[in-house]
């Protein structure tokens, strides 16, 4: 006979960070006797939910998708931006086999390496650091002809801010003693995603045929002329950069083309124009026989080209591992965060695992959640208490949306009410667990509600924060909490409490030290 499950409940308080400052801190201002009692009597600490600790760039605030992915995966899940940045820092980028293969083929035949990408510090579709590294890699591997075809931003950056980026790349090439910027064009053309193929055609013909509406003898002169025509970065028309005595650059047979955008959606159309044998969206004057066309990441599985950083499938995430061990689990949230405790917590998988059940509680239909700061938390709690009392599940994962969704409204009084409602809900869960001898871990995915005003502007602060998040053990065991934890350590902690061995794929470390 199997033992009756005494559930381990993971309570994720969305947007519930920790700030030492009491100013405009809805958690500090709220009446929260249950929370205060837990912090006074139960082992607790703080863990990181932002920046490189969750696979985001340094200093980047966390978000719900990334937070739940890390919580469920039991390892830091690096986003594409940080995977590439980390590879450059570690030096691995410069030996990337997919890029190296294309570059080396071109070098062996004394052909050119063409670098395409959004030249921008924006960090949304690309980062100029990555383009600099690519130019350095091509030079290191012996390329004599290195050409950058720069797409200008102005959407994820100010509308007229491209000049420092162009100057930086000019300086990079000068330092290498080879290579140059060959063309500039706005992202409006090169990075269309709405099947406006006439725009993509302008970019393709500029890069492949050197066909341009305008020419200039330097990248900065090209930009200045565009500004004089009334164009901002995003809308700069096709311009070939042709220094005195040179010709417009073309893509020739045997050249290598490396597309350095890491975000897929706006890189697909131009990539298809380069590599699809039966491409028919616009007539190509010429389709060069390339030594290689490389996508930095997989823009689409259907595009016939290799990628330098293929998707990393997440295996043995918490849900999958529990299912393999015959454990039952319940995922529960209201509509606003239901995808987070299911799809994202399961590492990007839609289907439930064997032994997994799900409960979706509808979110209230109000214009903004400051009008109903309790949201559907009481109804969510009703179902959790019922599930605990039934003792049917080994693990229950619940998300409470209030801290984040009410925090986003910027209404301080509503945020305080949201925290007070959460406190009542936690009290009910703790009481139910007490009766059956269950345990809970309380944490958050990122901060928000602990900072409701931006002190520098005096305006409401509606965004997430980089603050650490609480980690509280609720139960009868004697244990201590180690410092320096991150969200990726939560799943290994749950396995420790359940007496299950941690799978090799989970590289996080348990936060609890059992006495």
From Swiss-Prot:
InterPro entries: Alkaline_phosphatase_core_sf, BPG-indep_PGM_N, Metalloenzyme, PGAM_B_sf, Pgm_bpd_ind. CDD domains: iPGM. Its cofactor is Mn(2+). One of its GO terms (biological process) is glucose catabolic process. Its EC number is 5.4.2.12. It holds the Pfam family iPGM_N. One of its GO terms (molecular function) is phosphoglycerate mutase activity. The active site is at residue 64. Pathway: Carbohydrate degradation; glycolysis; pyruvate from D-glyceraldehyde 3-phosphate: step 3/5. It catalyses: (2R)-2-phosphoglycerate = (2R)-3-phosphoglycerate. Keywords: Glycolysis, Isomerase, Manganese, Metal-binding. Substrate binds at residues 125, 155-156, 187, 193, 263-266, 337. One of its GO terms (cellular component) is cytosol. It is an enzyme of class 5 (isomerase). It comes from the Bacteria. Binds 2 manganese ions per subunit. Mn(2+) 2 binds at residues 14, 64, 445-446. Mn(2+) 1 binds at residues 404, 408, 464. Belongs to the BPG-independent phosphoglycerate mutase family. Catalyzes the interconversion of 2-phosphoglycerate and 3-phosphoglycerate. Monomer. This is 2,3-bisphosphoglycerate-independent phosphoglycerate mutase.
């Amino acid at each position: 006979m199997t033992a009756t499950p005494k559930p381990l409940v993971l309570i994720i308080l969305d947007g519930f960070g920790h700030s030492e400052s009491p100013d405009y801190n809805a958690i500090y201002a709220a009446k929260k006797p249950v929370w205060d009692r837990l912090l006074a009597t139960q082992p607790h600490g703080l863990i990181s939910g932002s920046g490189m600790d969750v696979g985001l760039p340094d200093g980047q605030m966390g978000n719900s998708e990334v937070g739940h992915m890390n919580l469920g995966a039991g390892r830091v899940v690096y986003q594409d931006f940080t995977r590439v940045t980390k590879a450059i820092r570690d030096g691995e980028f410069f030996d990337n086999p997919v890029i190296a293969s294309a570059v080396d083929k071109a070098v062996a035949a004394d052909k050119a390496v063409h670098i395409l990408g959004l030249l921008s510090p924006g960090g949304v579709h690309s980062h100029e650091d990555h383009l600099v590294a690519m130019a350095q890699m091509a030079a290191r591997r012996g390329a004599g002809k290195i050409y950058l075809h720069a797409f200008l931003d102005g959407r994820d950056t100010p509308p007229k801010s491209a000049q420092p980026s162009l100057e930086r790349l000019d300086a990079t090439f000068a330092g290498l003693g080879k290579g140059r910027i060959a063309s500039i064009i706005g992202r409006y053309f090169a990075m269309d995603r709405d099947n406006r193929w006439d725009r993509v055609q302008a970019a393709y013909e500029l890069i492949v045929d050197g066909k341009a509406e305008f020419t200039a003898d330097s990248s900065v002169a090209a930009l200045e002329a565009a500004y004089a025509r009334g164009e901002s970065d995003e809308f700069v028309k096709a311009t070939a950069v042709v220094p005195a005595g040179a010709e417009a650059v073309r893509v020739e047979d045997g050249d290598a083309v490396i597309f350095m955008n890491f975000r897929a959606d706006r890189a697909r159309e131009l990539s298809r124009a380069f590599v699809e044998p039966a491409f028919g969206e616009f007539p190509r004057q010429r389709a060069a026989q390339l030594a290689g066309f490389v996508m930095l990441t997989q823009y689409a599985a259907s595009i016939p080209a290799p990628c330098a950083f293929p998707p990393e499938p997440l295996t043995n995430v918490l849900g999958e591992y529990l299912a393999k061990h015959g454990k039952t689990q319940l995922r529960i949230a209201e509509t606003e965060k239901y995808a987070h405790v299911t799809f994202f917590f399961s590492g990007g998988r839609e289907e439930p695992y064997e032994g997994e059940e799900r409960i979706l509680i509808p979110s209230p239909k109000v214009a903004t959640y400051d009008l109903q700061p309790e949201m559907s938390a009481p109804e969510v709690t009703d179902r959790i208490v019922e599930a605990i009392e039934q003792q049917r599940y080994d693990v229950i994962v619940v998300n409470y949306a209030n801290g984040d969704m009410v925090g986003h409204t910027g209404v301080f009084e509503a945020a305080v009410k949201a925290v007070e409602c959460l406190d009542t809900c936690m009290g009910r869960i703790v009481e139910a667990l007490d009766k059956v001898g269950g345990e809970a871990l309380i944490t958050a995915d990122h901060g928000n509600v602990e900072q409701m005003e931006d002190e520098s502007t005096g305006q409401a602060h509606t965004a997430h924060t980089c603050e650490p998040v609480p980690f509280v053990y609720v139960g009868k065991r004697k244990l201590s909490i180690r410092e320096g934890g991150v969200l990726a350590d939560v799943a290994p902690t749950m396995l420790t409490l359940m007496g299950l061995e941690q799978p090799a794929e989970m590289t996080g470390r348990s936060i609890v030290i059992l006495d």
